[in-house]
Amino acid sequence: MTSGLLTPIKVTKKRLLSCAAALAFSAAVPVAFAQEDTGTAITSSDNGGHPGDWLSYGRSYSEQRYSPLDQINTENVGKLKLAWHYDLDTNRGQEGTPLIVNGVMYATTNWSKMKALDAATGKLLWSYDPKVPGNIADRGCCDTVSRGAAYWNGKVYFGTFDGRLIALDAKTGKLVWSVYTIPKEAQLGHQRSYTVDGAPRIAKGKVLIGNGGAEFGARGFVSAFDAETGKLDWRFFTVPNPENKPDGAASDDILMSKAYPTWGKNGAWKQQGGGGTVWDSLVYDPVTDLVYLGVGNGSPWNYKFRSEGKGDNLFLGSIVAINPDTGKYVWHFQETPMDEWDYTSVQQIMTLDMPVNGEMRHVIVHAPKNGFFYIIDAKTGKFITGKPYTYENWANGLDPVTGRPNYVPDALWTLTGKPWLGIPGELGGHNFAAMAYSPKTKLVYIPAQQIPLLYDGQKGGFKAYHDAWNLGLDMNKIGLFDDNDPEHVAAKKDFLKVLKGWTVAWDPEKMAPAFTINHKGPWNGGLLATAGNVIFQGLANGEFHAYDATNGNDLYSFPAQSAIIAPPVTYTANGKQYVAVEVGWGGIYPFLYGGVARTSGWTVNHSRVIAFSLDGKDSLPPKNELGFTPVKPVPTYDEARQKDGYFMYQTFCSACHGDNAISGGVLPDLRWSGAPRGRESFYKLVGRGALTAYGMDRFDTSMTPEQIEDIRNFIVKRANESYDDEVKARENSTGVPNDQFLNVPQSTADVPTADHP
């Protein structure tokens, strides 16, 4: 289905029959779809139109995630009950925003699957599996997630992790067209490690889709396809062609004239692609008739390796506005020039109307990874103001005229050549979890967090590895040492002391927090605001909450059995208001940070969609709380080999199976797996890809058999030195690990402020 590149697959009767196993089936949708133009309907959503639907990723083009529904409100939300649940077929991370159109819910799930459900009952109407190959999993940094779909005139559109964009008939689930979005002929870097996990957006009949991959090696771009035919309309690259040549794209003129001079004439960007992937936020604004792109980090992260430590590297860490008809550049605002911290600008872009110096302005409000809350003019891109929404130690504020950061000298770690502990770290003060805005309270609700990172350069200069992250960082220092060395124990305590998660209700007029809601740890779900003066949010500890939007008081809590990182939606079906959310623990925090992620709350995945109403009568089945249980490891390993294996593990394995071989609860904990117990069994798994179909790719082209054996010895060593602690943590009446990370208690300190961590 990926052949033909930009030529959409032509759907014939024969092709449909031959693909029957992968196509959707079952009964017709029991509702009538509206005949109104979808663009008009989405536009009206900001003005009270279609209150019972959720037609676009952020509900409306403004992406405020605000619903005018108020059947559920502060007076009765405490009476919410589970109305229905639908168990998913993949117990991995779920980040999707379901769409609801005339009583039908369209939910994208892990491995890029699409489910159409009756929004009133949760009954499956049809299902579509694009059959993403398992070996594609290691091309992505952060789980095989999908953040959502788009709806347009009777069709639903979604991206697949292997780079396709698919259009389905919304009523039947049958394939209309499919196109591969990654052009073979383009200069995209040597790695070409592209994935699609973001939700497409539709602007004036064009389906917009970006991609990810900068951790491995990629050159960012956004493509626009005709919603009816799947034909490519235009493409915009976000960083220059390495030879400063035209790509035959809408971005040619601006990249060659303005962006290319901001990059070093040499550097790893010319081989790695430079980065700048648009993996999440794409927004069409009908008020300005512009499309806003949130542009990501550099590839590699290391600024000195990437660009010789020269130039601002446009358009990394920027919001770029382009013409939706032509894809041509209109303006840009760079939030993080010279990015060397993975401070992406792909976080949710939101538009709203608000007073600025006594005048109503149409603005973009943005809370990217770097910790600053920005307000910029939506028409011109002119900086209006910016303040930290959390503690940050990389900049001494922003220039009041230009918005350029005033760098802390030590934060420029690639130029000083010295390690630097950054707050925020690479996961940002705010990541993909969606924020929301209420026009009633005039507050923006941000799922904020604080996860530091020690930045230090790759030893011996930049070296790229196939099938691995290529950041230009010392991967041995990206996590926490896990032993009884007093210095390492002290370092863990210091780390956990500043590890936090909270929701900040930000007043964009005062540029200050109105209130905050403390959570157990970071990596919590997105927000929903409603006219009932309620905000809804799922948490990493497995709870689903409703808070008073005016003061943050906790009004309702439901044990969802698994962590929630997705944002909720609300809608009506048969005249009744529901609130729904996807459940499932995943993403890069539990993948890479492993055991540290346990401090947000122990959770075992039971991935599903859950929906609430005031008269719900459903209940969840019993849950498995134990997760991966310790198994007595083989007692012997080679000390010299395990030392070499530590570097190889951190380079090739930690991004999925956790720092220092401690799983964060999504993928198998290799310490307790049977594979490392023998050399041959481990090589079959890692070298020959015995579990490729399940997402564990083969690495015999990336590592030698001896290097794979080194990794096995390291895992056995880690199993032996952590087994007793893991068993001890489960010595209680439930058998569930207690609230500790290797006997280092989590801090209960207050959330950080702008001037204190």
Curated annotation (Swiss-Prot):
It is a peripheral membrane protein. Keywords: Calcium, Cell membrane, Disulfide bond, Electron transport, Heme, Iron, Membrane, Metal-binding, Oxidoreductase, PQQ, Pyrrolidone carboxylic acid, Respiratory chain, Signal, Transport. Induction: Constitutively expressed. It comes from the Bacteria. This is Alcohol dehydrogenase (quinone), dehydrogenase subunit. The active site is at 342 (proton acceptor). Its EC number is 1.1.5.5. It catalyses: ethanol + a ubiquinone = a ubiquinol + acetaldehyde. Ca(2+) binds at residues 215, 297, 342. 2,6-dichloro-4-dicyanovinylphenol (PC16) and antimycin A inhibit ubiquinol oxidation activity more selectively than the ubiquinone reductase activity. Heme c binds at residues 653, 656-657, 696. CDD domains: PQQ_ADH_II. Residues 1-34 form the signal peptide. PANTHER family: QUINOPROTEIN ALCOHOL DEHYDROGENASE (CYTOCHROME C). InterPro entries: Cyt_c-like_dom (IPR009056), Cyt_c-like_dom_sf (IPR036909), PQQ_b-propeller_rpt (IPR018391), PQQ_MeOH/EtOH_DH (IPR017512), PQQ_rpt_dom (IPR002372), Quinoprotein_ADH-like_sf (IPR011047), Quinoprotein_DH_CS (IPR001479). Binds 1 PQQ group per subunit. Optimum pH is 5 for ubiquinol oxidation activity. The alcohol dehydrogenase multicomponent enzyme system is composed of a dehydrogenase subunit I (AdhA), a cytochrome c subunit II (AdhB) and a subunit III (AdhS). One of its GO terms (molecular function) is heme binding. Residues 726-757 are annotated as: Disordered. Belongs to the bacterial PQQ dehydrogenase family.
